[in-house]
């Protein structure tokens, strides 16, 4: 399916690895010009940058000044904004172990980074009378988990923000949607210091056992791949989804078992 994204100008946050990198790779392959915001780059992202279609802007998007700095270097035209930056620290010590500093850091990264990046990018979209905003949310927005309590709260806030914004800017040609993955085969879950390893350290179970147990809760029996999330994001960014706004798309292998 040709998504007709060639020549579009896109901004992706958190694009150095995992889901974000897959989105950047997909947009570039479709012919879009992509500005990527990340705190640090990666070998894979640097390789994409050498193609000339991808520009990397190093910015701490959890810092209040980071999003405006990124958008300020993205050019005058922004057709697509993908708010992807985020993190889900596992809180194996329970609610009482989560400090004010933990809450603040999680909300800054998982909610306010998207709010601020959207605030910075939206004027250009409104001036053009067109634009697409897709934010990476999470199944934890509707399945709050005590092991990622602060993350669940932040993602619920992100879902509410995007739904409310879609009602405000939809009449002005801007579409706003969210994508909510379940466990994805990325470093956030499976890498050094990821969820599986953190839970392993707290419980004594091997990291692979933790990951296998999580996968068994999904109807498909496996984690979602980053490229599968990216494919969904690219579809929503395209004109094929021109009458879709204010919607949340779950991609979780059947983890959520309710309607």
Question: Could you tell me what each predicted segment is?
Answer:
Residues 138:
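Residue(s) in the substrate-gating loop at a strand-loop-helix junction
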Residues 118, 154, 162:
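Active-site helix of classical SDR
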Residues 92, 143, 222, 233-234, ...:
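Short C-terminal tail/terminal secondary-structure segment
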Residues 123, 167-168, 242:
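Alpha-helical segment proximal to the catalytic Tyr-Lys
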Residues 9, 16-17:
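Conserved glycine-rich cofactor-binding loop
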Residues 91-95, 99-107, 199, 214:
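Substrate-binding pocket helix/loop in short-chain dehydrogenase/reductase
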Residues 170, 175, 244-246:
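Short, small/polar-rich loop/turn modules that mediate ligand/substrate recognition or access, typified
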């Amino acid at each position: 399916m040709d998504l007709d994204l060639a020549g579009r100008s896109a901004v992706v946050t958190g694009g150095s690895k995992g889901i974000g990198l897959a989105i950047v790779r997909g947009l570039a392959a479709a012919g879009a010009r992509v500005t990527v915001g990340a705190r640090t780059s990666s070998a894979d992202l640097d390789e994409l940058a050498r193609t000339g279609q991808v520009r990397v802007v190093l910015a701490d998007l959890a810092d209040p000044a980071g999003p405006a700095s990124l958008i300020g270097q993205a050019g005058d035209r922004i057709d697509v904004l993908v708010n992807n930056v985020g993190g889900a620290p596992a809180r194996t010590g329970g609610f009482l172990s989560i400090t004010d500093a933990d809450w603040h850091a999680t909300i800054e990264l998982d909610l306010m980074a998207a709010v601020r990046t959207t605030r910075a990018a939206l004027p250009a979209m409104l001036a053009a009378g067109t634009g697409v905003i897709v934010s990476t949310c999470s199944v934890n927005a509707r399945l709050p988990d005590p092991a990622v309590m602060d993350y669940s709260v932040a993602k619920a806030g992100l879902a509410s923000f995007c739904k409310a914004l879609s009602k405000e800017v939809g009449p002005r040609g801007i579409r706003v949607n969210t994508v909510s993955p379940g466990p994805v085969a990325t470093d956030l879950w499976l890498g050094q210091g990821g969820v599986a390893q953190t839970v392993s350290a707290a419980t004594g179970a091997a990291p692979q056992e933790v990951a296998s147990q999580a996968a068994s809760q999904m109807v498909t029996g496996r984690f979602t791949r980053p490229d599968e999330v990216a494919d969904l994001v690219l579809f929503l960014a395209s004109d094929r989804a021109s009458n879709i706004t204010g919607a949340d798309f779950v991609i979780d292998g059947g983890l959520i078992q309710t309607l």
